[in-house]
Curated annotation (Swiss-Prot):
Species of origin: Lagothrix lagotricha
Biased amino acid composition, Acidic residues: 37-54
Protein name as catalogued: Transcription elongation factor A protein-like 1
UniProt keywords, alphabetically: Nucleus, Transcription, Transcription regulation
GO (cellular component) term, any one: nucleus
Pfam families linked to this entry: BEX (PF04538)
Function text: May be involved in transcriptional regulation. Modulates various viral and cellular promoters in a promoter context-dependent manner. Does not bind DNA directly.
Region (Disordered): 1-98
Compartment(s): Nucleus
Length: 159
């Protein structure tokens, strides 16, 4: 009776040997090359941040990067924490959600974009004057288009 017990005890000892060999053969997924990991991180960031939303999130992302690592929010948390916008982004930016006339918004945005307009630094008065000129040109163009349309259709026969 002692011999079968000893044989039964030997079999379980041989089984762990095969189990010990298996982990050495398998490759853990943590041993990926750093290039693969960085490309995966980039693709996840691209999926999470559509390009048209990046300009709006940039100030918040920069603020979170200035904080110490323990206080820093991850980019995904930063994106999810934003309140939903009233209107979807339309490529123009968030100015459609702001109040005020075009000239007022232009004067308010000046400090952000100083020197961006063809390398010139304009005063608020110069910017407002340029906006007035643009609005005047739009009005004249619309008047000319209306006059042309009326002249075209006032004839008894088509041109």
């Amino acid at each position: 009776m002692d011999k079968p017990r000893q044989e039964n005890e030997e079999e379980p000892q041989s089984a762990p040997k095969t189990n010990e060999e298996r982990p050495s053969v398998e490759h853990s997924p943590e041993k990926q090359s750093p290039e693969e990991q960085s490309s995966e991180e980039q693709s996840s960031e691209e999926e999470f941040f559509p390009e048209e939303l990046l300009p709006e999130l940039l100030p918040e992302m920069l603020l979170s990067e200035e904080r110490p690592p323990q206080e820093r929010l991850s980019r995904k948390d930063l994106f999810e924490g934003r309140p939903p916008m009233e209107q979807p982004p339309c490529g123009v930016g968030k100015h459609k959600l702001e109040e005020g006339s075009f000239k007022e918004r232009l004067a308010r945005s000046r400090p952000q974009f100083r020197g961006d307009i063809h390398g010139r630094n304009l005063t608020n008065e110069e910017m407002i004057q340029a906006a007035d000129e643009l609005e005047e040109m739009k009005r004249v163009r619309n008047k000319l288009m209306i006059m042309h349309w009326k002249a075209k259709r006032s004839r008894p026969y088509p041109i």
